[in-house]
């Protein structure tokens, strides 16, 4: 018997069954490490997204996961309230806009009818004014003979008196 024969070592590491278990365990450990790293990265990302915690990565005492979740929850609730307020403001502005558009349409309608009336009355008045813009009687025929700009004395005839000589 040799020295090697006396020491028989049951080595499970050499058996195919152990390689399968060891590989499974190593694979499981790698997956678990990857999962924990992903969770850790997600918490860091969440921490960096919350304004109240943005300076925490440089501070001596970092926020715990529970603190990160609490602050994130508070921030989400705050943003929901703010979003709701903004939505109400948007709805109010839409109502105001609709009201103003309705008023504009009403004013344009009034303006249109006023312009039509002005055009109609200006066309009517052109029948009763001479080219100088002076009022003319409908029975006058449009002559300039009696313009309002002449003094009263010039419009009336002066009587000629023969002098006694």
Swiss-Prot record:
PROSITE patterns: BHLH
GO CC terms in record: MLL1 complex; RNA polymerase II transcription regulator complex; SMAD protein complex
Composition skew (Acidic residues), residue ranges: 1-13
InterPro entries: bHLH_dom, HLH_DNA-bd_sf
Stretches the record annotates as Disordered: 1-38, 47-66, 119-165
Keyword presence, Nucleus: yes
Basic and acidic residues bias (residue ranges): 14-38
Keywords attached to this entry: Activator, DNA-binding, Nucleus, Phosphoprotein, Repressor, Transcription, Transcription regulation
Top-rank taxon, per record: Eukaryota
A GO MF term: protein dimerization activity
Primary location recorded for the protein, binned into one broad class: nucleus
Chain intervals for the UniProt region annotation (Leucine-zipper): 86-107
Compositional bias (Polar residues): 56-65, 119-132
Modification note: Phosphorylated.
Residue ranges, compositional bias (Low complexity): 140-149
Known function: Transcription regulator. Forms a sequence-specific DNA-binding protein complex with MYC or MAD which recognizes the core sequence 5'-CAC[GA]TG-3'. The MYC-MAX complex is a transcriptional activator, whereas the MAD-MAX complex is a repressor.
Family that this chain belongs to: Belongs to the MAX family.
Subunit structure: Efficient DNA binding requires dimerization with another bHLH protein. Binds DNA as a heterodimer with MYC or MAD. Component of some MLL1/MLL complex.
Protein name (database record): Protein max
Organism expressing this protein natively: Danio rerio
């Amino acid at each position: 018997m040799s020295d090697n024969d006396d020491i028989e070592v049951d080595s499970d590491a050499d058996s195919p069954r152990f390689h399968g278990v060891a590989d499974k365990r190593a694979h499981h450990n790698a997956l678990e490490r990857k999962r924990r790293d992903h969770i850790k990265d997600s918490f860091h990302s969440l921490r960096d997204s919350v304004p109240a915690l943005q300076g925490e990565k440089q501070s001596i005492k970092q926020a715990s996961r529970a603190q990160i979740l609490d602050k994130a929850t508070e921030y989400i609730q705050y943003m929901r309230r703010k979003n709701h307020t903004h939505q109400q403001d948007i709805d109010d502005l839409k109502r105001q806009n609709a009201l103003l558009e309705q008023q504009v349409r009403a004013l344009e309608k009034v303006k249109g009818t006023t312009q039509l009336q002005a055009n109609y009355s200006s066309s009517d008045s052109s029948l009763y004014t001479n080219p100088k813009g002076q009022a003319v009687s409908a029975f006058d025929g449009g002559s300039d003979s009696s313009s309002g700009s002449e003094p009263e004395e010039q419009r009336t005839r002066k009587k000629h008196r023969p002098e006694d000589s």
